[in-house]
From Swiss-Prot:
Entry keyword annotation includes Iron-sulfur: no
Keywords: Methylation, Ribonucleoprotein, Ribosomal protein, RNA-binding, rRNA-binding
Gene3D superfamilies the UniProt entry points to: Ribosomal protein L11, C-terminal domain (1.10.10.250), Ribosomal protein L11/L12, N-terminal domain (3.30.1550.10)
PANTHER family named in the record: 60S RIBOSOMAL PROTEIN L12, LARGE RIBOSOMAL SUBUNIT PROTEIN UL11M
Gene this chain is encoded by: rplK
A GO term for molecular function: structural constituent of ribosome
SUPFAM superfamilies, sorted: Ribosomal L11/L12e N-terminal domain, Ribosomal protein L11, C-terminal domain
Function of the protein: Forms part of the ribosomal stalk which helps the ribosome interact with GTP-bound translation factors.
Family statement drawn from the similarity comment of this UniProt entry: Belongs to the universal ribosomal protein uL11 family.
Record-given protein name: Large ribosomal subunit protein uL11
One cellular component term from this protein's GO annotations in UniProt: cytosolic large ribosomal subunit
Keyword rRNA-binding: yes
GO biological process: translation
Length: 141
């Protein structure tokens, strides 16, 4: 018989640096999850992606056990890293924050493809290009 799900929790945590302090502790503690066990597993599975923010979806069962699924880093994090800027422009229509190449755009789209609502890389590139435009990042051809 399948276990009954008691909660689903979504968090965005720095890779390899999850610790019991907020926001992890309170989010998991209220559902009775072993926080240290989650932190150790998360840090082990994201050790190769240090420096990125990795969203995670945690499914908590009624017996207080849990499973979690790692997602791809947010497009905004990948774009700022590719453009070499700290954050997007406050006024994307007037001020440009940085520039990325078409090849970098394709690489980000391929990386994000599993989490995007797109069937192919071309559609994913359009989605990522829209995010870049809203951040004030120019795509050079």
């Amino acid at each position: 018989m399948a276990k009954k799900v008691s909660a689903k929790i979504k968090l965005a945590l720095p890779a390899g640096k999850a610790n019991p302090a907020p926001p992890v502790g309170p989010a998991l503690g209220q559902h009775g999850v072993n926080i240290m066990m989650f932190c150790k597993e998360y840090n082990a599975r994201t050790a190769d992606q240090v420096g990125m923010v990795i969203p995670v979806e945690i499914t908590v069962f009624e017996d207080r056990s849990f499973t979690f699924v790692l997602k791809t880093p947010p497009a905004s994090v990948l774009l700022t890293k590719a453009a070499g800027v700290e954050k997007g422009s406050g006024k994307p229509n007037k001020e440009k924050a940085g520039t990325i190449t078409g090849a970098q755009l394709r690489q980000i789209a391929e990386q994000k493809l599993p989490d995007l609502n797109a069937n192919d890389v071309e559609a994913a590139m359009k989605i990522i290009a829209g995010t870049a435009r809203n951040m004030g990042i120019v795509i050079a051809d």
